[in-house]
């Protein structure tokens, strides 16, 4: 484990000790858990659903596969994966227990509880043996990890040979004018939505800031390769507002 006692990282635009970030991220998602899915729809005007479908299209789930859905929260990616696969099993891991509670409710309502496990844990120190899973996904979560490279290294470790990594995350628009317009929307509208719908402006201010601090597409692609993944590629979604990164453990 890396010694984080004297190191700093970012929490949105704020510089904080590495040892504090996980707890502060946990506080954000504990605060918004019950409204998280609704806010995703409102903030993206439903477009996040199209991005997740694009993720499933590229991933092409197969029957019998074992999925690890990290930062899986309320289970949205896992449910989509299992429905596409026909049958299989998903383990949803998240740092925030209250997000998993919401996911369990969804699983029970959908009569899918027997296909899912829910685990509280850290993406940088996964509580699983080497070579356990066929697929690893993390959707809108890796930018909240204190050391994303360590999370990618852990993804490589727990995937079986032939296993696949798929990351869906907000990214950077290549056109500066479009990025400026998107920033105006993000910083002026999304925190206000957070206050109106979830009663929490600060958490959504953090989420907007965290997007701007995340590496661009090419930088993150190098991180995927540095973790050991091969055939690593990315696909922009909505002109780069979001991006999919894929890699294989061969």
Swiss-Prot record:
S-adenosyl-L-methionine binds at residues 74, 94, 122-123, 139. GO terms for molecular function: 2-methoxy-6-polyprenyl-1,4-benzoquinol methyltransferase activity; demethylmenaquinone methyltransferase activity. SUPFAM superfamilies: S-adenosyl-L-methionine-dependent methyltransferases. One of its GO terms (biological process) is menaquinone biosynthetic process. Keywords: Menaquinone biosynthesis, Methyltransferase, S-adenosyl-L-methionine, Transferase, Ubiquinone biosynthesis. Methyltransferase required for the conversion of demethylmenaquinol (DMKH2) to menaquinol (MKH2) and the conversion of 2-polyprenyl-6-methoxy-1,4-benzoquinol (DDMQH2) to 2-polyprenyl-3-methyl-6-methoxy-1,4-benzoquinol (DMQH2). This is Ubiquinone/menaquinone biosynthesis C-methyltransferase UbiE. It comes from Roseobacter denitrificans (strain ATCC 33942 / OCh 114) (Erythrobacter sp. (strain OCh 114)).
């Amino acid at each position: 484990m890396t010694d984080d006692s004297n190191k700093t990282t970012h929490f949105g635009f704020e510089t904080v000790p590495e040892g504090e970030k996980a707890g502060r991220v946990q506080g954000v998602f504990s605060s918004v858990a019950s409204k998280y899915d609704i806010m995703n729809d409102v903030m993206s005007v439903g477009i996040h659903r199209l991005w997740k479908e694009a993720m499933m299209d590229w991933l092409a789930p197969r029957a019998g596969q074992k999925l690890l859905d990290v930062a899986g929260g309320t289970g949205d990616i896992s449910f989509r994966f299992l429905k596409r696969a026909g049958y299989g099993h998903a383990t949803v891991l998240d740092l925030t227990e209250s997000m998993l509670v919401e996911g369990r409710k969804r699983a029970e309502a959908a009569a899918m509880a027997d296909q899912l496990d829910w685990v509280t844990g850290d993406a940088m120190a996964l509580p699983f043996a080497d070579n356990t899973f066929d697929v690893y996904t993390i959707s809108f979560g890796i930018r909240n990890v204190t050391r994303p490279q360590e999370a990618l290294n852990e993804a490589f470790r727990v995937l079986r040979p032939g296993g696949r990594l798929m990351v869906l995350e907000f990214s950077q628009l290549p056109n500066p004018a479009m990025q400026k317009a998107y920033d105006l929307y993000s910083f002026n509208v999304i925190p206000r939505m957070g206050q109106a719908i979830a009663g929490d402006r600060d958490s959504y201010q953090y989420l907007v800031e965290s997007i701007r601090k995340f590496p661009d597409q090419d930088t993150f692609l190098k991180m995927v390769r540095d973790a050991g993944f091969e055939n690593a590629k990315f696909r922009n979604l909505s002109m780069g507002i979001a991006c999919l990164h894929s890699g294989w453990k061969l």
